[in-house]
Amino acid sequence: MNTSVYDKLQKVLDDRNVEGYLGLIHDDAQIIFHKSGDRFNKSEWVSVVGGMMRNPKFVKDASRCIYEDSDMLVSDTFMSYPGDTKEAVMLVCMLKDGQIIRMETR
């Protein structure tokens, strides 16, 4: 049985495994932050996500998969951030060949 992209994503985030995380991101991926409007390609995203995963104050408190099929993943996560703020983050991903080709947070 194949492990879902959501389950793989949760595992690499829990383990703070940057290489494993980047393995889930398609080489042609676009990452978009709705709140700030920032956009990244995979090579730009590498340093951003690496810094987040190395910071112990960047914490995934709880997460649930709302929907996943071979083309799309939607999850809802409660996050804690370095500035002692907390947010609910909706993640919407388009999938291609088992990898994230487009990721947008809300």
Describe the predicted segments one by one:
Residues M1-N2:
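Generic helix N-cap/helix-start motif at coil->alpha-helix transitions
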Residues D7-K11, G23-G37:
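Short, solvent-exposed secondary-structure junction/capping segments
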Residues R16-G20:
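Short helix-adjacent coil turns
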Residues I32, V46-R106:
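A beta-strand edge to alpha-helix "cap/lid" segment located at domain peripheries
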Residues G37-D38, D61:
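Sparse recognition of residues in long alpha-helices and their boundaries
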Residues R39-E44:
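Short beta-edge strand/loop motif at the mouth of beta-sheet-based domains
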